[in-house]
A protein has these predicted regions:
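N-terminal helix-turn-helix
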Residues: 1-76
Length: 77
């Protein structure tokens, strides 16, 4: 099966946020990505509502779109 690198990277970034808000540098380290790539991924995911920047902070956390997707799991299983 072929790999889609951008999807793998997006999931790595999302996984880096599962323990709470973190900054770009920590996301990059946890996801094993260059800092510039992590920053671009976070910006793209933020536009989609999958992550959000903590108000008054430079850290990111999982966003409302992820919460909405997760809440649908209970009714579909």
């Amino acid at each position: 099966m072929s790999r889609v690198q951008s999807i793998e990277r997006a999931f790595a970034v999302l996984s880096a946020l599962t323990d709470g808000p973190v900054g770009v540098t920590d996301v990059a380290e946890r996801a094993d990505l260059p800092k510039s790539t992590a920053a671009r991924m976070l910006a793209s995911l933020a536009r989609e509502g999958a992550v959000e920047q903590v108000p008054g902070d430079t850290r990111y956390r999982l966003g409302p779109r992820i919460e909405a997707l997760a809440s649908g799991l209970g009714s579909s299983r």
